[in-house]
């Protein structure tokens, strides 16, 4: 049985974290819909991440919005309002978009989306920067401030 592209994407990011990586637990419980795909924790904090993979994101004229269910949006928004670290990480053919601060529900113009993509290595480093202390990486995260188009 072949794996889904999303599963391959998650595993690539985990490999790019190297030997020093946060504890992570893949979550998949059909009885509690809406909970993100992976929970991370380490000396620097906790992070909940919903992963999506859309190879066509950013191509054409269609605005980009992660394909989240209403339950996922509600769960993510609820935890964000509680002050927890939550993110949606969308992989595509051109790179990776990291959505934080509730912006997972805001459509992005394709040109804005592609201008703010990071590499898979940068996404892996971003996760480490949110969950581990003193790991020697200089990643501050990547959050587009405002959409201009």
Where are the model-predicted features located?
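Short, conserved beta-strand edge motifs with alternating hydrophobic and charged residues
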Residues: 27, 48-51, 89
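Mg2+/Mn2+-dependent nuclease catalytic core
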Residues: 55-75
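Charged phosphate-binding loop/patch that engages nucleotide di/tri-phosphates or the phosphate backbone
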Residues: 112-149
